[in-house]
Amino acid sequence: MTKSELVAQLASRFPQLVLKDADFAVKTMLDAMSDALAKGHRIEIRGFGSFGLNRRPARVGRNPKSGEKVQVPEKFVPHFKPGKELRERVDGRAGEPLKADDPDDDR
């Protein structure tokens, strides 16, 4: 699901919400989450999962073109850990074959 598909689904699920307002709501939520992660905070959404940061230590890498050794600095990367309810919901579909996205499928 893309951001625009999420906005469209949100607007269709709540008829009083105009598409422009749904887009603003999604954008605001994503901006707030990005800002929190950039400040080093953890985000927990009960029943869904948590977002945090994982530290990748500095290391010696290799330039694939020249083969030259390069120092890669330490960095932090976003990490998502699904919650129990989300894992169970996704696992319930484990035996089902993959199919094209169905906009009417609310699972």
Swiss-Prot record:
Matches recorded under SUPFAM superfamilies: IHF-like DNA-binding proteins (SSF47729)
Region ranges (Disordered): 76-107
Transmembrane segments: none
UniProt feature, compositional bias: Basic and acidic residues: 82-101
Signal peptide extent: none
Entry's Gene Ontology BP terms: DNA recombination; regulation of DNA-templated transcription; regulation of translation
Domain of life: Bacteria
Cysteine disulfide partners in this protein: none
UniProt entry keywords in alphabetical sequence: DNA recombination, DNA-binding, Transcription, Transcription regulation, Translation regulation
GO terms of molecular function: DNA binding; structural constituent of chromatin
GO cellular component, as recorded: chromosome; cytosol
Keyword check for Transmembrane helix: no
Pfam families the record matches: Bac_DNA_binding
HAMAP family, alphabetized: IHF_beta (MF_00381)
Function: This protein is one of the two subunits of integration host factor, a specific DNA-binding protein that functions in genetic recombination as well as in transcriptional and translational control.
NCBIfam families, per the entry: hip, PRK00199.1
Family stated for the protein in its record: Belongs to the bacterial histone-like protein family.
Oligomeric and partner information: Heterodimer of an alpha and a beta chain.
The protein's name: Integration host factor subunit beta
Protein's organism: Burkholderia cenocepacia (strain HI2424)
Gene: ihfB
